Structure formats: structure tokens, C-alpha cells
Amino acid sequence: MEMPMPPDDQELRNVIDKLAQFVARNGPEFEKMTMEKQKDNPKFSFLFGGEFYSYYKCKLALEQQQLICKQQAPELEPTSAMPPLPQPPLAPTASLTPAQGTPSMDELIQQSQWSLQQQEQHLLALRQEQVTTAVAHAVEQQMQKLLEETQLDMSEFDNLLQPIIDTCTKDAISAGKNWMFSNAKSPPHCELMAGHLRNRITADGAHFELRLHLIYLINDVLHHCQRKQARELLAALQKVVVPIYCTSFLAVEEDKQQKIARLLQLWEKNGYFDDSIIQQLQSPALGLGQYQATLINEYSSVVQPVQLAFQQQIQSLKTQHEEFVSSLAQQQQQQQQQQQQQPQPQPQPQIQLPQMEADVKATPPPPAPPPASAPAPTIPPTTQPDDNKPPIQMPGSSEYDTSAGVQDPAAAGPRGPGPHEQIPPNKPPWFDQPHPVAPWGQQQPPEQPPYPHHQGGPPHCPPWNNSHEGMWGEQRGDPGWNGQRDAPWNNQPDPNWNNQFEGPWNNQHEPPPWGGAQREPPFRMQRPPHFRGPFPPHQQHPQFNQPPHPHNFNRFPPRFMQDDFPPRHPFERPPYPHRFDYPQGDFPADMGPPHHHPGHRMPHPGINEHPPWAGPQHPDFGPPPHGFNGQPPHMRRQGPPHINHDDPSLVPNVPYFDLPAGLMAPLVKLEDHEYKPLDPKDIRLPPPMPPSERLLAAVEAFYSPPSHDRPRNSEGWEQNGLYEFFRAKMRARRRKGQEKRNSGPSRSRSRSKSRGRSSSRSSSRSSKSSRSSSRSHSRSRSRSSSRSRSRSRSRSRSSRSRSRSRSRSRSKSYSPGRRRRSRSRSPTPPSAAGLGSNSAPPIPDSRLGEENKGHQMLVKMGWSGSGGLGAKEQGIQDPIKGGDVRDKWDQYKGVGVALDDPYENYRRNKSYSFIARMKARDEFSTFGTRKEEKED
């Protein structure tokens, strides 16, 4: 294949040459990055199949060949200084393999294939843009043609549409509708008006109110079209209703979509459109796509030339790719023929093309290293030319070395190069091999696995090498929580970390960040600590008889992005199922644990802060109780410990409003569902204790990423995180209600029995007292008994009034206590006034806000919204308060009438006295007539 002609523009040629050099050095990733950054730059059109694409590809192939020669030239220099060696009677050796990282022919073909796909996608996107532009231009030309035919003044139509957009009043909609019906003289007139509405609604800068108000206008026009049988205008609106509705529906959020969806239900109910249009409106995305396809078919004369031009361009790119592949195949054939014609023991210094992957696979593996105790032999006859090359020490390879001694660099010469030592010294800057790998096509098993627990090779993540400096960036604190060396938990043995990982809080020399009376900032870690997660199977679980690492769980959940935290080690087991224990023992045992997502993330760095009960770092908290760590592990896993309320070390020394809110949780019973005041004296601090497996599982589940089984809500919290708790809460509440209903009849029976007993006792007492009393007393008593009988309404009529009143007061003695209990509720402290303050809550502003419908209507009618009501703001400013309780004769008086009028009060008092006099006169007259009758 001949070299294509370079561009005449020297600047463009320099750009192509420089880019070919950079891509040859840095690999195809650099080309991808350049294509993404320069996709809109016309100078880089050769990357997307432009005019000089073939010149760029040939230049790139030449640069890659030159890079291969430069990389292999230093490897041939030691062979020229060596004496000639006798040729063994063996088969001719294969030519020198290309250096690792140099693209082979297959890679070049794949790179060209990927480039072809990218260019094709880019051309398809450009084709779509040009087709859309061509269709829009054709539609605009059609509108201009209709405008010339009808001679309608569309500016007058716009003047009528503007009030509809601004206020959407009935008068504005009626004016727009009347103008449309008065100008709907012919089908072109109707198409022009409908097309104008479509252009206004589907414009890119149209806001939601504009679209919604104009759709209201269309709805009114459709209604009158059906009433007046205006078929031409109805047919014109049917053509444009799909893009109008679908564009407006897809451009807004869900709450605004409901307003538009109501119109669709109305249209479907009234039968304005046929079934095909209704189906397109019910699925807006599909309907909009069908409408665009209809436009392409309608304006095919404009669209076909654009599509044909792009198809030709894509076909030319495919042809160039096929020519490039055939050229590489021909060069490979020529190279193989040259190798068969000129067999030589040593490779030639000049290699024109990269080797095939098959040649790389045919090269024999490097010889195995001899034992270290054997002396270094002299150069054997079959020694390869690059055996004397000094080994390249790779960074990070020492991490996998399990031997205690240091390798002798002099012993590496006769041993031969390792699999990671075949890297040329002048490797390109983009080539970086962090781990030792074998050459292409060779699967060389390791002589001895670096880890005794893994026979298949080293794990993906290197060990920490007994140091946490590189991960955390600063030292950790002392093993004690509060800096006390003589604490009862400091004399216990360290956990077993299998000699690979050091204890996370051992061998420290600086004061702990959570100790002392002053808090220090948390650790500045680049990634979360791995010791908090589950342990790999080749390690033993640490003994949890050490003081726990302090945490602070009073934090918001982190950002739920997968990039924030590294993936978990592949050998680590999944976390424990997060099932939580309830102190009342009402855990839903029939519900299994939720599924856990395998790609969970590690705990957040902010979790390393201290809890408020972690020793004397806060001067107001008491010290941890002695011997808290003496429980065996199987006792610790049984659930929450029993808190001794008499322990003085658990009583907080600060006000209750300075304590964490979580300390209220033990005081609220599971069956409680109504407000009950809590006594601050009952609050106790949790005793210090090692974290249980359930607690660790809960923390792990809290910081794990969202999954299908555990979705998140809009604020980032787990959707069903408290499902088990709410389920247990509802069960306890239901059980309590059932018990209350079951115990209801028995309680009423006991009350009636006690009521009967008390009445019998009181009746016996009253009978005894009545015998010893005089007649006058009994008369007065009987008079009082008649009054009390009318008041008490007791069931028993055999006993006297005093006994009835006594028995009633005794049997009903529970009601005042209930009232007293309800009055003794502690009021909830106001949140606005702040905790511990006695100031009254602020008086809320009684004026109506802008979200009030009445406020909005008054603004539309010309009210400024700042002063009183009315155009001149002469009315009241504050809204009318709610009506107070009035007397019967005042309840029909209007708003603003003074109820404390002195004249009205005087008149009312006089009426009271007049009525009293009239009643007294009537009584006196009736008494006099009775007396006269008796005398007679």
C-alpha cells in the first residue's frame, strides 16, 4: 500500500504527525481521549474518517514500527561485545519477540476496528442532526408558503396569545378561541394556526406555563369544534396534537405531568381524537418517535440526499479499514518468507514490522533459575543473548516476597531474567506494570506460592507489611480508650492476625486521638480502614476481648457513589445478615434476613470518631465500670446487656438535653404509641463493651451501597431500613390493644360489684342514723334526698340520698385521678426557643403568603401584595381571625360589630331584671290565689 499524500497545510500536517507520535507512545487510550476532547474541532476531522484519515493511519503504523526498533536496539548491543559462540546443532530459533506492551498485528486490527466503530457512531449522530435540521427547514418553508397563501397576520395572533400565557383567564382564552374560529376560513388557514401553536409550544425555550396555558386554549377550541362541527380546524389540530402533548409531557417532572394527563383523560372521554392518536398520547416517548418518522417520510425528498451522503462516507471508512487489514496481512507474509529464506542464529537489528502473536507464543520460556547454593556456571552454548542483562527491579515486587533476607543482585545474572524482567530499560512512559506477569501466551506456574493458604497465586491485594503508615497517613493512638495504661483491659493478649496484619491499634507511640480532655480531628485517610470489615478466610477472627475501636454512629449516610470506596477484597466473605434485637423480645422471627448486595462498601472514614462514653475525654461523663470486659464471648452475643440503674458510673453528669438522643430509646417500650413524658432521671449511659457481631453487621449494612433488595429513597436513606422495627412495633401495639379489649368486661364487672358493696354498706349506715334522728332532720334530709336523687340518677332506689352520694363518690373515685394525670403531662419544649430557655415561642406571621390561592387571585386583579386590600391598599392588612364563641343573641351579628357596647349591655341587664320581676310577680300571684283557696 502506497503512502498517501500528506495535507498541503503545514500546520495540519504537524498536528497529524505529532498525534501519531503520541498515540504510538501512549497507546490507543490517548487516541480515545483525543477523540472525546476534539470531537467538535474541524482540524481533527481526520480522526473520524475525514480527508486525511488514511495518511494518519499510515503515519501511526510507521511511528509504531520505529518505536519497536528503538526499544529492541539496546537489547542487541551486549551481543556485539560478546565473542562468537559455537552454533549448536539445533533447529533455527525464532526471531526476537517484540517487547512487552508493543501492539501486535491483532491489536492494530482491533484498534482500527474500534476506531471504525467510533467514527461510524459519530457519523450517525451527525446524520441525525442534519436530518433534523433539514426537516425543520422544510417545515419552516411550508409555514412560509401557507402564510403567503392565506395572508394572515400572525402578529395579531401572538398579541392574543400573550395574555393567555401570562394570566390564562377565561376572557383571554375566549378571545383567542374567537379569533381562531373567525379566521378558520379554509384548510390552509387552519393548518397555519395549528402549526403556529405547535411551533410556540415545542420551542426549546418554552416554559411549562406557556405550554400548559396554550394546551388549555387548544382544549377549549376542541370543545367548540365538536359543538360547532368545525371539521377542518379539528383535523388541523389532530395533526399537531401529538408533538404538542408529548413534548410538554416529557419536558417536566412528575407533579406537573399530572396536570397535562388530566387533559388527556378529558379528550379520551369526549372522543376528540381516534384510537391511534390516543395510543400515541398515552405513551409520549413512542408517540414522539412515530411523529418524527412520519415527518421523515413526508419530507423524504430532503432527507434522502443527507442519508445517502453519510452512507457513502461510512462505506469509504469500511473500505479503508479492509485495505489496512489486508496490508498488514501482506507485510506479515513477506516477513515470514524472509525468515524462511535467511535463517540466522541471532536476530537482525532492524525489524520492520511487529511480530505476530503466534510468534510470541512459539518462543520458548526462559530457563529455570539454578539453585542458590550452586556456583555460577560459565556461559553455556545455549545461552540466550539477553541472559547477561541486569534484572529490572520492579516497584512493589518486594511486597510479595516472603523471604526474610534480601536478594543478592549479583546472583540474578546467571539465574536468567524472570517473567517481569523482560521489560526494556527505555519503556514508554505509559507502560507501567505494577505486578509481575508472564509474557504473552506463557502460563508459567510459580515455583513456590508466596502464601501458604493460596495455591493459585498471590491474592489481588498485597499485605500491609506490618505498617499502616501508607494507608492512614498518620499514627493511631494508644490501645487504651482514655490513655490509662493500668486499665483492666490493657493486660490482655493481642488478637491473632495470622502474622500478616498488625492489630489496628497496636505499636503506637503518640497519644490517642480520642483520649484526653480535648478532642482532636479525625484521621485523614485516603480510603476506609480494612480492619473494620469481615476477615478473609485465611485469617482467624480477632479475639474481641480487646477494647473496641470507638465509633460515632450519629452521622448522616455518606454519598452513595461506587467511586467513593474501593471494592472489597475478593476473598472476604459477605457481611452478617443485619437482624436487630429488641429489648422487649418481640423480634419477628418468621421473617428472614434481607439479601445483601455483594458490592458493599467499607465503613465511612468519619466512623472513627469516639462515642460520648469513651472514658474521660469529656469531663462530664463518668468512667467506664470496672470489669466490663469479663463476660465470655458467648454471653456477649446474646443481646443487649442488662443495665444496672444503680451503677453510679452510668448516671450522666450533664443535662439531658446535652446527651445523645439515642439514650431515650431504652425508655420507650415497644408497645408505646402515644405520648408519655420521660423522666430524665431514668436516662443511663450504655456500659462500655466490645462490639457484637450484630452491631458490626448493622454498621456494615448501613454503609453498604444501594441494591435491588435494599433501595434508597430520595434523601439517601434505606427505604426499608426500619421495616423489622415497625413490624415488631405494630405487633406489640396490636397485642396491647387485644389485651385491653379482653380485660374490658371483667373490669366493668368488678366496678359494678364494688359499687354494689359500697351502696349496701352506706345504706346500712344511713338506716342506723335515720332511726336516731328527729323528724325535722329526716324532713330536711328527705328534701335534700329528693334533690340529690335528681342529680345522682343512681340505679338503686332502696338506699337514701346520702348513702347514694357517698357510694357514687367512692365508686367514681378513679375519674379525678385520670383527670389529674392528664393535667400533669409535661409540655413539649418549644423547638424554636431552644433547649433550656424559658422564652416564649415567636408569634407567627398571620399574613397570607404567595402560595395562597386568594393571594394569587388578588395579585392577578391588580393588588400589589404589600399593604392593605384593594387597589389603593385602603382595606385591612391582616386576615380576619376565627370567630369566637358568642351568646345566642350575638351569633348572627356581622364581623366588626362591637360586642361590648355599654348601651347594649345596659339594655340586656335591664331585660334580665325585668324578666326576674315578672317571674316573681307571677309566683306571688299564684301563691296568693292558692292561699285564698285554702282559706276558703
From Swiss-Prot:
Q: Where is this region: Disordered?
A: 77-102, 328-646, 731-887
Residues where Phosphothreonine is found: T828
Its annotated compartments are: Cytoplasm; Cytoplasm, Perinuclear region; Endoplasmic reticulum
Single biological process term from Gene Ontology: RNA processing
Kindly list the positions at which N-acetylmethionine occurs in this protein: M1
Modified sites of kind Phosphoserine: S822, S824, S826, S837, S864, S866, S913
> Biased-composition ranges for Low complexity?
330-355, 488-500, 551-560, 759-773
Glycyl lysine isopeptide (Lys-Gly) (interchain with G-Cter in SUMO2) cross-link, renumbered residues: K853, K881
Sample GO molecular function, one term: RNA binding
Please give the GO cellular component terms listed in this UniProt entry: cytoplasm; endoplasmic reticulum; perinuclear region of cytoplasm
Instruction: Enumerate composition-biased segments (Pro residues).
Output: 81-91, 363-383, 534-550
Q: Where is the CID domain?
A: 149-289
Biological function: Involved in calcium homeostasis, growth and proliferation.
Q: What is this protein called?
A: Calcium homeostasis endoplasmic reticulum protein
Q: Which organism is it from?
A: Mus musculus (Mouse)
